Design a protein with these regions (language model features):
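A ligand-binding cleft/hinge motif common to bilobed small-molecule-binding domains
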Residues: 77-81, 101-133, 240-241, 256-267
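Extended ligand-binding regions for polar small-molecule ligands
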Residues: 23, 73, 135-177, 219-222, ...
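Hydrophobic/proline-rich hinge and linker segments of small-molecule sensing/allosteric domains
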Residues: 44-58, 139-143, 194-197, 270-285
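Positively charged n-region of N-terminal signal peptides that target proteins for export
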Residues: 1-11
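Extracytoplasmic/secreted envelope proteins and their assembly/folding machinery
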Residues: 56-59, 72-80, 94-97, 101, ...
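Periplasmic-binding protein-like
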Residues: 116-153, 181-183, 187, 200, ...
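C-terminal motif of bacterial Sec signal peptides marking the signal peptidase cleavage site
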Residues: 15-19
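Extracytoplasmic small-molecule ligand-binding "clamshell" domains
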Residues: 30-36, 41, 47-49, 59-61, ...
Length: 285
C-alpha cells in the first residue's frame, strides 16, 4: 500500500489522470464497502456531509467516521479495522481527496508524501500531525523469481554508492540542484527489457510529468535496471491490478510505494526494503 517537502506539481488534483477502469472520477470503485453511501441514499450522504464538517484532531477521532481510501492499499486494510468506520474505496487517491472536499467522506488515509502534496495544493484540507502508522516499502516480484536476488544485490549497491540518497534529495529532501539518478554514459542493456507495473498518481513516488512517468520509484527502478543491464519499461495501471499483472507475466515487477503485508506475500515475493513510509490522515479544515 506508499512517503521532506513535496514535489511542486501543477494541478495535482487535475491529474485526472487516465484511469484503466470505467469508474467515473470521484465515484467509489466497484466493490466499495459502502458505495451507496455517497450516491444511493440521500440520508447517508447528508450524514457524511455533516460529519465531514467536524474537525478531526487525532487518529482516535476516526472511530465511527466515513473514511476514503485507495482500493487495495494498506490504508484500505487499516481503515477496515477502525471501529464503526464506513470505508469508501476509490481507484485513485485523487478521487478519495475529491470526495473529502465534497463532504462525502470525513477523512482519507493516505501515504505521507502524497498526502503532503494534496495538503499543500488544497487550502480546505489538512494533514493530521499524528501518524497513522509507519511501514517499509519494497519491490514486488513473482513468487520464486530469479530477479529477486539480483534486485536485492542492486538495491544494496544503490544504497551504498549514494544513488538512493541522491534520488531522495531530489524528490523529498528538497536539496537545491539535486539531479537524482542519471543513467551513466555508455550504459548497455545486454539482458533485454524489464516491465515495471505502477500506479502513476502517487507523487512523489510516481506521477506524470507531461507524458513521462517520473518520481522516486521510477528513478530507483531505472537505477536498478541500469545496474543489471536491462532496459526499463513502465506500465501505468490501477493499484489493485499491479500484483495480478506480475502474476500473469504482463509485468516483471511492481513498484508503487508498496508495503510488505502477509496477504500480498501469498501472491508475490518482495525485495529488501528500500524506503520507509508513513500512513497519514487528511481531513477538512
Amino acid at each position: 500500500m506508499k512517503k521532506l517537502i513535496s514535489v511542486a506539481l501543477a494541478g495535482v488534483m487535475a491529474l485526472g489522470l487516465a484511469a484503466c477502469g470505467s469508474t467515473p472520477a470521484s465515484e467509489p470503485a466497484s466493490g466499495s464497502t459502502a458505495a451507496s453511501a455517497a450516491y444511493g441514499s440521500s440520508a447517508a450522504s447528508a450524514s457524511a456531509s455533516t460529519e465531514s464538517k467536524q474537525y478531526i484532531f487525532s487518529v482516535d477521532d476516526l472511530t465511527g467516521k466515513t473514511i476514503g481510501v485507495q482500493l487495495g492499499t494498506t490504508g484500505d486494510t487499516y481503515a477496515q479495522d477502525i471501529e464503526g468506520a464506513t470505508v469508501e474505496q476509490y481507484n485513485k487517491f485523487n478521487d478519495a481527496v475529491l470526495a473529502l472536499k465534497q463532504g462525502k467522506v470525513d477523512a482519507v488515509i493516505i501515504d505521507n508524501e502524497p498526502g503532503k502534496v494534496f495538503d499543500e495544493q488544497n487550502d480546505d484540507i489538512i494533514m493530521l500531525d499524528e501518524d497513522f502508522t509507519v511501514e517499509d516499502y519494497a519491490i514486488a516480484l513473482n513468487k520464486g523469481s530469479e530477479l529477486t536476488e539480483k534486485f536485492n544485490e542492486a538495491i544494496a549497491a544503490i544504497k551504498e554508492n549514494g544513488t538512493m540518497d541522491a534520488i531522495l534529495d531530489k524528490y523529498i529532501n528538497g536539496v537545491e540542484g539535486a539531479e537524482g539518478y542519471v543513467t551513466p554514459e555508455g550504459t548497455e542493456y545486454p539482458n533485454g527489457t524489464l516491465t515495471m507495473a505502477t500506479n502513476a498518481y502517487f507523487p512523489p513516488y510516481e506521477y506524470y510529468e507531461g507524458d513521462e512517468i517520473v518520481g522516486i520509484d521510477a528513478e530507483f527502478a531505472k537505477a536498478i535496471c541500469d545496474y543489471l543491464g536491462y532496459e526499463l519499461k513502465i506500465e501505468d495501471m490501477e493499484f489493485a491490478s499491479i500484483i495480478p499483472a506480475i502474476n500473469s507475466g504482463k509485468a516483471d515487477f511492481g513498484a508503487a510505494g508498496m508495503t510488505v503485508t502477509e496477504e500480498r506475500l501469498l501472491n508475490v515475493d518482495f525485495t529488501d526494503s528500500y524506503c520507509t513510509g508513513i500512513q497519514s490522515v487528511l481531513v477538512l479544515k
